[in-house]
A protein has these predicted regions:
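Short, His- and charge-rich active-site/binding loops that engage polyanionic ligands
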Residues: 60, 65-69
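Residue-level marker of intrinsically disordered, low-complexity segments enriched
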Residues: 2, 30-32, 124
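Low-complexity intrinsically disordered segments
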Residues: 70-136
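The transition from N-terminal targeting/processing segments to the mature protein
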Residues: 14-27, 34-35, 69-72, 76-82, ...
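Intrinsic disorder/low-complexity detector
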Residues: 5, 50, 69, 135-136
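Amphipathic, interaction-prone secondary-structure segments
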Residues: 18-61
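Charged, compositionally biased non-catalytic regions
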Residues: 1-18
Length: 136
């Protein structure tokens, strides 16, 4: 597990945490990342940790009432959130296994498929897993 104290500081007068990127990058090598371009939405990440592939999707908001990280009042709470996100990553043993999952997953049966960013993420991930545009 990641120790969030290496990613975030707890200081006098701290008004909270808002940036998920340190956590996202601490989980591994980001191969593809697509975020919604809005004040609230989802982040989708494909990891490639030396051939072990990870898939993470999580939502975020614009205030402490609708965003889990902004709602954290202590680093212990940030740690709990980080652990939950890390544990929610779906891991595949190989690119081939991940590619099969991406190609056969019922994306159309999911609410997230109706967002252009999800379609972009899926398409970029498939291209990456097929070996195309590995410099994404």
């Amino acid at each position: 597990m990641i120790d969030v104290r290496t990613l975030y500081k707890e200081e006098e007068g701290n008004y909270g945490w808002y940036d998920y990127q340190p956590m996202i990058e601490a989980f591994g090598n980001v191969a593809v990342q697509v975020d919604d371009d809005d004040y609230q939405g989802d982040t989708r990440v494909l990891y490639d940790n030396n051939g072990k592939i990870g898939h993470l999707v999580f939502g975020w908001g614009s205030c402490s009432g609708c965003d889990a990280l902004q709602a954290c009042e202590t680093l212990d709470e940030v740690q709990e959130l980080c652990n939950m996100l890390e544990n929610s990553i779906i891991w595949f043993d190989s690119k081939a296994e991940a590619l099969k999952w991406f190609e056969t997953h019922d994306w159309g049966g999911s609410w997230e498929w109706f967002y252009d960013e999800t379609k972009k993420y899926v398409n970029l991930s498939i291209k990456y897993l097929e070996g195309e545009n590995n410099g994404l």
